[in-house]
């Protein structure tokens, strides 16, 4: 994992913890909604990522962004 990947991963995790402290035990590769994230918190995270990384997450992609790992890859791809 390169430095950018690690920075983005840490930012995503820390953002989720700020949204709700119960999210500090999430697994990177497991479905976020199966781990207890609700849709409101998911949209809060998307908003935070759009603001921080100056990107726009397409609504059609929401269903694909169901793990922390997929969100990280999406942000990396959009930033390039």
Predicted regions and their residues:
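Thiotemplate assembly-line natural product biosynthesis machinery
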Residues: 1-24, 76-80
């Amino acid at each position: 994992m390169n430095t950018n990947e690690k920075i983005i991963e840490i930012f995503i995790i820390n953002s989720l913890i700020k949204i709700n402290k119960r999210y500090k035990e999430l697994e990177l590769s497991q479905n976020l909604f199966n781990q207890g994230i609700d849709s409101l918190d998911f949209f809060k995270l998307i908003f935070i990522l759009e603001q921080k990384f100056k990107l726009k997450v397409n609504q059609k992609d929401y269903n694909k962004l169901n793990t922390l790992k997929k969100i990280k890859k999406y942000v990396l791809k959009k930033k390039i």
